[in-house]
């Protein structure tokens, strides 16, 4: 347990940041799930509306990942890894012959 004033403050700040990062990561995971869901929906029923939904969900997820990396919530290599996963899923949905 923290004994002096500055160490108590650091504990409070760390807890605050942990909760903020947790919320940010949760929102990020939600956007990624939406993108994967849009991929499977496009595979089931390809069309202009499904493709628009797919691209908008991909853009939103990419934006959130980039912001998470910028804020320090996620390591840049982890961000690149997640963006790669999303890109591969979208590419496979749009062009099924490419695996």
From Swiss-Prot:
Keyword rRNA-binding (UniProt): yes
Alphabetical keyword list: Ribonucleoprotein, Ribosomal protein, RNA-binding, rRNA-binding
Matches recorded under SUPFAM superfamilies: Ribosomal protein S20
Annotated Gene3D superfamilies: Ribosomal protein S20
Keyword Manganese attached: no
InterPro entries: Ribosomal_bS20, Ribosomal_bS20_sf
An example Gene Ontology CC term for this record: small ribosomal subunit
GO BP field: translation
Pfam families linked: Ribosomal_S20p
Molecular function as annotated in GO: small ribosomal subunit rRNA binding; structural constituent of ribosome
HAMAP family noted in UniProt: Ribosomal_bS20
Primary role: Binds directly to 16S ribosomal RNA.
Similarity comment text for this entry: Belongs to the bacterial ribosomal protein bS20 family.
Descriptive protein name: Small ribosomal subunit protein bS20
Annotated source species: Synechococcus sp. (strain CC9311)
Gene designation per UniProt: rpsT
